[in-house]
Amino acid sequence: MSGPCSAHRVPPIGPRPTIRSPRITRSSRMTEPKRPSRRGTTRTRPAPDSVGDDNPYLDAPASRASSESRSESGSGLSAEGSGSDAPRPRRPRQPRRPAADAESAPTAADTNDSAPAPTARRGVRRTTRSAAAGTDVSSSTSELPRAESPRSEPRTESRPEPRAENGSETRHESRGGSSEGRPSFRDPSPSGYEASMERPLADRPDAPNRYDRAFDRTDGPERQDTRPERPFQQERPFQQDRQDRHERQDRPDRRDRNGRRRGRGGRPDNRGPGGDRHQSTGPAADRSHDRGPDRNNERAFDRPERPDRQGESSDRFDSQDRGGNRQRNGRRGRNRFRRGAGGNESAPISGSHAPSQGSPSAPIGVEGTMAGWFDPSRDGGFLRRPENSYLPDPTDPFMPPALVRLHQLRRGDRLEVTYGRDHRGRYLVIEVQTLNDGSPVVLEKRPDFNTLVASYPDRKLTLETGRPAKTGPELTRRAIDLIAPIGYGQRALIVAPARAGKTTLLQAIVEGVSINHPEAVLLVLLVDERPEEVSEMITWGYGEVVASSFDMPPKRHVEVAEMTLERARRLVEQGKDVVIVLDSITRLARAHNTVDRGTGRTMSGGLDATAMQKPKAFFGSARMIAPQHGGGSLTIIATALVETGSRMDDVIFEEFKGTGNCEIKLDRSLADRRIFPAFDIATSGTRREEKLYRPDQLEKVHLLRRGLHQLPPQAGMEWLIKRIAATTNNDSLLDGL
């Protein structure tokens, strides 16, 4: 057999050394012809030129590799021999040679001992393959019998050393497919060491090529003898995790993320739907083919295993079966959405947020019964007690929203309820027994107070009691009935300077209403008054006293007044007569000016422009309801302070001056002379008083008033007091004129 390979054989000299891979420098590697591009091409094996057809095991790649090795060793044979201009074909897989063959084969490494140390890994690998090919050719040409097939040779000592050759073979086979006469990387019938490498990937043909590269990489020949072999038979947990990830790439919510994914080193990751990487183009693809075969292999085995991620991937895959719920469990079973263990929505919630089992929702027992006024809140309401002036207290029982809706409760309704305690120890209303001293069912269709039609009073509130009137309250009551009579639904304003006797006047009115008109509901409202006057009024025992003394905050004054007004409105809706005695409306307006949120526009005296809205609404609620509209009345007798030296008090009085239909003015000069009652007869009076007097009394009252106007205020009041003390009642006084 003739050819360049057989003509340039070098006989062995001396003892036969072991086969060593030749080492070349960067300059020698630069002379190597450029490898053709492998992108999108189908590689074919060209016919051998220099080797005869009778040796099928020797092909052009081996011949060319041998000639390259001889040209680099300085033998004089040109590298441009046969087949140098043809495209570089795929190299055959070089089997591990037994020790006997290695001793009989000539070596080409002796001629290259003077070559410098390798500077790059690519040159080392190519030279190694060339030298191996040249050695095989020389040995095959020296022996007339053909060499045995690589598949028939036993691989008995291939454990610690074949990493470079196997790595290069695996790399070429995984990229370009298998050539004729040798099995591919995914050959279903491998044997020995190759079978152990290919078994996990053969079981999963759609596994990503990332693992192919991980098994192919190496760090060069210096690690071939020191690194022990790692088992490939068992499948690692992270491989199963990555397989599950690729199986879920067809989900709609993952497509955008795959499109934006980047590979290692900033290169785009071109994995397809099945996990296989598309064939890359450009210089990045060439660099990826020239990368060290075992680099990824080292990283894959040096990276610590994460056994907990296998459960994580299975949990994510199982989440697709729960109606598309895309919950993502964290590592070690942590759930991002804080559901049950393993992400199950139906798992019971544990911890401090879990509802207590068997906790009672109803009161434990009945504590007793109580009466109070209903004060609504956002959810339900509370029952305010009279001993606290119907103000909030921690012991007030709570009214459930169901009872509020059932009985259509409104603020100010008087209730008698049965209450108990819930599981937290709070007071809770169990049952409503009475509503406004009647059945709760009867009051379901009551009218609204704002829809009631107001009219002038036509029924007189007689204050005269028939008691001796030498001095004291009876004298005051009889004087009021003659000068400024008060009727049901009257809006009376008592204009009183300081120390003019307004408190005594109010006490006389309260006593007369309580004695003469017990059917009327009397409410005494004391706002910002002296505590001793509050105590005296309560001790007196006439009417129901609701008070807030001056040592209380302004907010309490406002709350007390609003609750009292709402209570009076609820009674009027039922057709009852209510009388409110307020002391004083000036202090109430001051409290609203302090508490309410103003607009920033102030009148003289520092009074806000909107501070008088609620006090006016309070005073304007007094009205008499005609019988055809349901009847009932609300009478308000309020005091207004004047001559206090405060400009604000004067402005408040001017605001109320034209709102009342009855006005009683007290004279400070008469009070200084100890003349009581100190009425200013000329400025006191009642509008539409003809509706309150009998026809026979009306003319006599006009005659009396004309006579009193002719006298000075002091003399006229002194004369009237003497006439009242001389008579037993007003009828006898008028008859004596």
UniProtKB/Swiss-Prot annotation:
<dbReference type="InterPro" id="IPR011113">
    <property type="entry name" value="Rho_RNA-bd"/>
</dbReference>
<keyword id="KW-0547">Nucleotide-binding</keyword>
<dbReference type="Pfam" id="PF07497">
    <property type="entry name" value="Rho_RNA_bind"/>
</dbReference>
<dbReference type="InterPro" id="IPR003593">
    <property type="entry name" value="AAA+_ATPase"/>
</dbReference>
<comment type="similarity">
    <text>Belongs to the Rho family.</text>
</comment>
<dbReference type="InterPro" id="IPR012340">
    <property type="entry name" value="NA-bd_OB-fold"/>
</dbReference>
<dbReference type="InterPro" id="IPR004665">
    <property type="entry name" value="Term_rho"/>
</dbReference>
<feature type="compositionally biased region" description="Polar residues">
    <location>
        <begin position="347"/>
        <end position="360"/>
    </location>
</feature>
<feature type="compositionally biased region" description="Basic residues">
    <location>
        <begin position="328"/>
        <end position="339"/>
    </location>
</feature>
<feature type="region of interest" description="Disordered">
    <location>
        <begin position="1"/>
        <end position="396"/>
    </location>
</feature>
<feature type="compositionally biased region" description="Basic and acidic residues">
    <location>
        <begin position="376"/>
        <end position="387"/>
    </location>
</feature>
<feature type="domain" description="Rho RNA-BD">
    <location>
        <begin position="367"/>
        <end position="439"/>
    </location>
</feature>
<dbReference type="GO" id="GO:0003723">
    <property type="term" value="F:RNA binding"/>
</dbReference>
<keyword id="KW-0806">Transcription termination</keyword>
<dbReference type="GO" id="GO:0008186">
    <property type="term" value="F:ATP-dependent activity, acting on RNA"/>
</dbReference>
<feature type="compositionally biased region" description="Basic and acidic residues">
    <location>
        <begin position="145"/>
        <end position="175"/>
    </location>
</feature>
<dbReference type="InterPro" id="IPR027417">
    <property type="entry name" value="P-loop_NTPase"/>
</dbReference>
<feature type="binding site">
    <location>
        <begin position="487"/>
        <end position="492"/>
    </location>
    <ligand>
        <name>ATP</name>
    </ligand>
</feature>
<keyword id="KW-0067">ATP-binding</keyword>
<comment type="function">
    <text>Facilitates transcription termination by a mechanism that involves Rho binding to the nascent RNA, activation of Rho's RNA-dependent ATPase activity, and release of the mRNA from the DNA template.</text>
</comment>
<keyword id="KW-0378">Hydrolase</keyword>
<feature type="compositionally biased region" description="Basic and acidic residues">
    <location>
        <begin position="196"/>
        <end position="256"/>
    </location>
</feature>
<dbReference type="InterPro" id="IPR000194">
    <property type="entry name" value="ATPase_F1/V1/A1_a/bsu_nucl-bd"/>
</dbReference>
<feature type="compositionally biased region" description="Basic and acidic residues">
    <location>
        <begin position="266"/>
        <end position="279"/>
    </location>
</feature>
<dbReference type="GO" id="GO:0004386">
    <property type="term" value="F:helicase activity"/>
</dbReference>
<feature type="compositionally biased region" description="Basic and acidic residues">
    <location>
        <begin position="286"/>
        <end position="324"/>
    </location>
</feature>
<comment type="subunit">
    <text>Homohexamer. The homohexamer assembles into an open ring structure.</text>
</comment>
<keyword id="KW-0805">Transcription regulation</keyword>
<feature type="binding site">
    <location>
        <begin position="499"/>
        <end position="504"/>
    </location>
    <ligand>
        <name>ATP</name>
    </ligand>
</feature>
<dbReference type="GO" id="GO:0005524">
    <property type="term" value="F:ATP binding"/>
</dbReference>
<feature type="compositionally biased region" description="Low complexity">
    <location>
        <begin position="16"/>
        <end position="28"/>
    </location>
</feature>
<feature type="compositionally biased region" description="Low complexity">
    <location>
        <begin position="62"/>
        <end position="86"/>
    </location>
</feature>
<keyword id="KW-0347">Helicase</keyword>
<keyword id="KW-0804">Transcription</keyword>
<feature type="binding site">
    <location>
        <position position="530"/>
    </location>
    <ligand>
        <name>ATP</name>
    </ligand>
</feature>
<feature type="compositionally biased region" description="Low complexity">
    <location>
        <begin position="101"/>
        <end position="111"/>
    </location>
</feature>
<dbReference type="InterPro" id="IPR041703">
    <property type="entry name" value="Rho_factor_ATP-bd"/>
</dbReference>
<dbReference type="GO" id="GO:0016887">
    <property type="term" value="F:ATP hydrolysis activity"/>
</dbReference>
<keyword id="KW-0694">RNA-binding</keyword>
<protein>
    <recommendedName>
        <fullName>Transcription termination factor Rho</fullName>
        <ecNumber>3.6.4.-</ecNumber>
    </recommendedName>
</protein>
<dbReference type="GO" id="GO:0006353">
    <property type="term" value="P:DNA-templated transcription termination"/>
</dbReference>
<dbReference type="Pfam" id="PF00006">
    <property type="entry name" value="ATP-synt_ab"/>
</dbReference>
